[in-house]
Amino acid sequence: MSRILKMNGRRQMWSQLQNEIILNDTVHINGFEGIGGMNRPVFMCRKLFVDNCDKNFIFYRLNKYSFPNVRELWLASHPTDPEVIHRPFDKIYLLDQYKYLQRYWAPRNTDIESVSYGRYLVELFAYYPENIKLHP
């Protein structure tokens, strides 16, 4: 079974990871509210799940600076701004409830796929939790 790093904004502070490089290949970020400090962590994951996060977190942190290697973004939070779904992730899986935003903001973007919340959960729960792997 594949593994996933689960991070919850109610239990972990973004500021505790300042300037860290996180090496986990798959990451789930849930419930982060603010944008934290300027010295952000860098996640080297290839697959990223994001849900229940604040609009400021989505706008300011969900980018190629914080997540340079992400190929698959599974977004179960409101995308906040057209810029977010135009960021250079290879594939964005966006919940059905935000499909209307894709129609307005990125109607010709074939890298965005609308998915049900059920499919999101099936994909997310296919992973076994693991501890954080920090760059030495």
UniProtKB/Swiss-Prot annotation:
Stored InterPro entries: DUF5845 (IPR043887)
Family listed: Belongs to the mimivirus L163/R849 family.
Protein name from the UniProt record: Uncharacterized protein L163
The organism of origin for this protein: Acanthamoeba polyphaga mimivirus
